[in-house]
Amino acid sequence: MKRLLAISSLTLLASLVLLVVSPARSLAAQDEVTVVDALADAADSEDGDHDHDHEGDDHGHDEAAGDEHGHGDGDHAATPLLSFDGGSAIWNLIIFLCVLAILSKFVWPAVLGGLQAREEKIREDLESAEKASAEAKQMLSDYQLKLDEAASQVQTMLADARRDAEANGQKIVDAAKVEAAAQRERALSDIENAKKVAMAEMAGQTSKLAMQVARSVVGRELSADDHADLIRQSMERLPSQN
């Protein structure tokens, strides 16, 4: 495509040169014919002045010459401007070949070099655009992957936090249950100890009361054995506190 474009441009330039040169050569040829005719007229005028004494004899000759000259002018006037000239065609061909050689040596390489440089620049721009597009797509893919990873990590952290909260809550509940059981055991132990103390105090008071009653009734002091029997009997008579 580039070679055809260069050849077409060179052919167009050569044709323009030929169009400029050919009319110039035709005008030069016409000017040459005009100069020859002028010289012939001048020679005829000099001959007429030189033979003025023989005007009568040469009058017919001059008229004939005038008719011939006029006929020649008519022939020149009747000559077409676009007549084929072999010499001009050869010269035009030579000029065309010379112009074509000059253009091929100096213009053609510059044109081809410019076209190649432009094509290379366009190709590099396209490659750069494709590379930038590929990099942008890769960056977008990496960014989306990072977003997905971050979302997954957040979900994992939330699940861990929920599991830890549930585990800590269960631990707190278990600890509360253990503490409540321990407090219940301590309360039961305290109640049992208080019951035992109360029973012991009650037994002591009952023994004293029984001794006083017995002393007042019997009128004598009880022995230790009697005292123990009375305590035992009193304890048996008391209702159970359990």
Swiss-Prot record:
Keywords in alphabetical order: ATP synthesis, Cell inner membrane, Cell membrane, CF(0), Hydrogen ion transport, Ion transport, Membrane, Transmembrane, Transmembrane helix, Transport
Keyword Ligase included in the entry's annotation: no
Superkingdom in the source lineage: Bacteria
Cellular location(s): Cell inner membrane
Membrane topology, record value: Single-pass membrane protein
Any Gene Ontology CC annotation: plasma membrane
Transmembrane regions listed in the UniProt entry: 4-24
One Pfam family matching this protein: ATP-synt_B
Region (Disordered): 43-74
Gene Ontology MF terms: proton-transporting ATP synthase activity, rotational mechanism
Chief place of localization: membrane
InterPro entries xref list: ATP_synth_b/b'su_bac/chlpt, ATP_synth_F0_bsu_bac, ATP_synthase_B_chain
Biased composition range(s): Basic and acidic residues: 49-74
Family per record: Belongs to the ATPase B chain family.
UniProt cross-references to HAMAP family, sorted A to Z: ATP_synth_b_bprime (MF_01398)
Subunit and partners: F-type ATPases have 2 components, F(1) - the catalytic core - and F(0) - the membrane proton channel. F(1) has five subunits: alpha(3), beta(3), gamma(1), delta(1), epsilon(1). F(0) has three main subunits: a(1), b(2) and c(10-14). The alpha and beta chains form an alternating ring which encloses part of the gamma chain. F(1) is attached to F(0) by a central stalk formed by the gamma and epsilon chains, while a peripheral stalk is formed by the delta and b chains.
Biological role stated in the UniProt entry: F(1)F(0) ATP synthase produces ATP from ADP in the presence of a proton or sodium gradient. F-type ATPases consist of two structural domains, F(1) containing the extramembraneous catalytic core and F(0) containing the membrane proton channel, linked together by a central stalk and a peripheral stalk. During catalysis, ATP synthesis in the catalytic domain of F(1) is coupled via a rotary mechanism of the central stalk subunits to proton translocation. Component of the F(0) channel, it forms part of the peripheral stalk, linking F(1) to F(0).
UniProt-recorded name of the protein: ATP synthase subunit b 2
Organism: Rhodopirellula baltica (strain DSM 10527 / NCIMB 13988 / SH1)
